[in-house]
Structure formats: structure tokens, C-alpha cells
């Protein structure tokens, strides 16, 4: 159950980080209105708070989180931006998620 909780928390954390960064991108590059910076700031604050909820040491969380971030970012690319990832992108995601699994769930002696 801890693994499902951790994975779900990583996914939610990644979504809040991506939203918090994508909205300023829209403002800077796509002429979105300035008010989009308010939900962006709230999303990034939530991202930082969510990182504090993970059930292990901060450095390990940050290292493992990167693998899930890569996965969610490619889903964002596909679902939000409408760009289909290249097959090699999926290979990279698999490697990143394998690394996340090792970092988070390998037995510690």
C-alpha cells in the first residue's frame, strides 16, 4: 500500500510542478494574460508542500521523484500539447521509472 501511496503522491506532485511551470510559459511565450501567474504560484507552493509529505528522506524523494516527473511530463506533452512522444521517449521513461523504483523501494540493510 505504501508503494501505491508514494506513486500517487509523486504523480500529483509532478502535475502541480508542471502546471506551476507551464502557466508562466504560456504567459511568456504564448501571450497568456498575467493573471495566470497567480495559479502558477499557488501550484508551485502546493508542489513544495506535497514534496514534504513523502515518507522518506528528502534527498531520496527528490532523486526518485525525477523518474515520475519524466513520465508525467511526457503524458503532458501528449495530452496537453498534442505532441506524440517518440518511441525512444518511452524507453527513457521506462529507464527513469526503473531508477525511481530502485531508489524508493530497494531493501535497505
Swiss-Prot record:
Its main location: membrane. Coiled coil: none annotated. InterPro entries: UPF0060. The chain crosses the membrane at residues 1-21, 33-53, 63-83, 87-107. It is found in: Cell inner membrane. Keywords: Cell inner membrane, Cell membrane, Membrane, Transmembrane, Transmembrane helix. It is a multi-pass membrane protein. It holds the Pfam family UPF0060. Belongs to the UPF0060 family. NCBIfam families: PRK02237.1. This is UPF0060 membrane protein ABO_1373. It comes from Alcanivorax borkumensis (strain ATCC 700651 / DSM 11573 / NCIMB 13689 / SK2).
Amino acid at each position: 500500500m505504501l508503494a501505491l501511496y508514494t506513486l500517487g503522491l509523486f504523480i500529483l506532485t509532478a502535475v502541480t510542478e508542471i502546471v506551476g511551470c507551464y502557466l508562466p510559459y504560456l504567459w511568456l511565450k504564448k501571450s497568456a494574460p498575467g493573471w495566470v501567474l497567480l495559479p502558477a504560484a499557488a501550484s508551485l507552493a502546493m508542489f513544495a508542500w506535497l514534496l514534504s509529505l513523502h515518507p522518506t528522506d528528502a534527498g531520496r524523494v527528490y532523486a526518485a521523484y525525477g523518474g515520475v516527473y519524466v513520465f508525467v511530463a511526457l503524458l503532458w506533452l501528449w495530452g496537453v500539447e498534442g505532441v506524440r512522444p517518440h518511441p525512444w521517449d518511452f524507453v527513457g521513461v521506462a529507464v527513469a521509472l526503473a531508477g525511481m523504483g530502485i531508489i524508493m523501494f530497494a531493501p535497505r540493510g
